Amino acid sequence: MIDKIVFEEDEEYDLTQDSFRYGRVTTGASYNLVTGKIPETVLEQVKAKDDENDDVEFEMDHLEDKEAVQKTKTFDELYESQMPKYFEYQSNFSEVNGIWTLLFDQNHYENMSTFELQAAICAALNSKHYMMICVGIDAFNAVTGVEMSAKDRVVFRMALTRAVAGEFQPPLVKVAPKQLTGVSPMKRDISEVTSSIDVLFIPVIGVTDEVENNRFLIVVRVKEISDKVYQISSGRIYNELEGRVVEMSDMNEAFHKLIVEQSISDIQTRRGSMFMLEPEPFLEDSPVIFTGSKEILRENHEIPNILKENSTERSLSQSLLNLLDIQNIGWIFFGTALSCCIYNNAIKPLVK
């Protein structure tokens, strides 16, 4: 269920600072996830880019990619088997296997920016990891959640949509800016334009001093694995190293680590599957194994004999061809024809 709110009727919300509703940000701007504000000078640049990109076509072909759907199902299976539908306040957050998980406490939420989301998502994509960013877990792995109104949740959704749609190269979402956002309220949630990334607000219950249940664990999910190398539009490239988000120095380092090393690991994996398989349990006195061993040995003896015969035939043919001089082949034909004529005209009548 997507939270809805009409911002035009909200006196507390400053529409001029609603940076989530403007075009693709190509200057690497980062805005606050709570207030949604960026500097006015950057906002003007964003508006200018919005006018330039009005004609960009909206494409969602990746949503029909069967392989991507299969990968999403794999993430869903991992997620649904380990994550509950809600959390008790101060309950322990258990380790999630198979999904790279980043944890932030509720105090960090107030100062959290879209740049942190972009860097973590970039690192997950480049490292070929499923990922979850969980906001609302303290240093003791206790789930506290974050107090969020309906407006706060909408702002966070908008921030994530802008961060994903406008800052990655190659683009994660190919969308015309004003089809995605605009002066009107939000038209599309991130889950509507890409199947690879979404956000959930999981209820945190059991807080006695709160009248309404407005406490949630924020979970941003990267649900698909990509073979591409991504960078943020500011030129920064990120990777996962020992569970942390690490910035790479340049594209050359990214190419070496993310492509060359991956290729080497793939080759090693293939070699392992060919030559390093664990042997099956061996029964020494089993007649079945003994009979099978004889058949295998017989087949192994027959194969070299066939190969020897084939190689002998090839060597004889090759030697005959080597004896023939290709340049004198015409003289051979001429001599053959002359012999036939002499035989037919001179020798054959005498024999009769």
Curated annotation (Swiss-Prot):
Say which domain of life the source belongs to.
Answer: Eukaryota
Keywords of the record: Membrane, Transmembrane, Transmembrane helix
According to the UniProt record, one GO cellular component term is:
endoribonuclease complex
**Annotated GO biological process:** primary piRNA processing
Q: Does the keyword Membrane apply?
A: yes
Compartment(s) where it occurs, according to its Swiss-Prot or TrEMBL record: Membrane
Q: What are the start and end residues of every segment in region (SLFN-like fold)?
A: 87-235
Give the residue spans that cross the bilayer. Answer: 326-343
Deletion phenotype, per the entry, is: Exhibits no defects in piRNA processing. In a slfl-3 mutant background, almost complete loss of mature piRNAs and piRNA precursor accumulation.
How does this chain sit within the bilayer? Single-pass membrane protein
**Subunit:** Component of the PUCH (precursor of 21U RNA 5'-end cleavage holoenzyme) complex; consisting of tofu-1, tofu-2 and either slfl-3 or slfl-4.
Q: What does this protein do?
A: Component of the trimeric PUCH (precursor of 21U RNA 5'-end cleavage holoenzyme) complex, that acts as an endoribonuclease processing the 5'-end of precursor Piwi-interacting RNAs (piRNAs). The PUCH complex consists of tofu-1, tofu-2 and either slfl-3 or slfl-4, where tofu-2 exhibits endoribonuclease activity. PUCH-mediated processing strictly requires a 7-methyl-G cap (m7 G-cap) and an uracil at position three (U3). PUCH also exhibits a strict bias for piRNA precursors with an A or G at position 1.
The similarity annotation says: Belongs to the Schlafen family.
Return the protein name: Schlafen-like protein 4
Which organism does this sequence originate in? Caenorhabditis elegans
What are the leading ranks of the lineage?
Eukaryota, Metazoa, Ecdysozoa, Nematoda, Chromadorea
